[in-house]
Amino acid sequence: YYKDLSTGKIYAVNAEDYYLDVDAYIQIEPKSKRKFARLWYGWDDFAQGGINEHGLFFDAAITPKQQKIKGYGNPRNNLGDKILALASTVEEALEILEKEKIALNKSHMLFGDRTGQAVIVEWVGGKRKLRWIDDNKLVMTNFLLSKPEAGNHPDFRYDSIIHRINELESSGQEINLNKIGNTFGLA
């Protein structure tokens, strides 16, 4: 998730590297009386990531397994689709997670909205941890940012993405979707 400070443009990029062979697809849901229009990608009626008509973006990534939080659990439905259907801001997405008593113990989620607000949500050590956007970028891969020692860290992809974004920003070149996308795609 990247916000160009000179133009205010927001870019949400994903480089999917899921290690299982799944029959992934893109699902487009039109607006209805009570639900926002949305596009998500995933498989088996499971939204891995997507965006809605109000500019709320989300993505999820597998992380090292954590203990479950008492009274909370993993979703029993298509959580990503539900959030995109009902939330238009990061705060509203967080409210849905809390209302539904969701605490993922094998992954984390990133939410970003059209205002430039973004957060990574992790559930570590029996608590929900929020890592808010700092400056203008928020990146996650497959390690827990709030507990890197849990596994999958150091992560060359994360380091490469941060390095490439910093290089792009200091180059003086125009920042656009292609260039931001390549900071992820080349990692």
Q: What residues fall within each predicted segment?
A:
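Acidic, contiguous internal or C-terminal segments within carbohydrate-active enzymes
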Residues: 81-90, 94-100
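C-terminal, well-structured catalytic/ligand-binding subdomain of enzymes
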Residues: 2-85, 107, 113-187
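Surface-exposed patches in mature extracellular/periplasmic domains of secreted proteins
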Residues: 94, 106-109
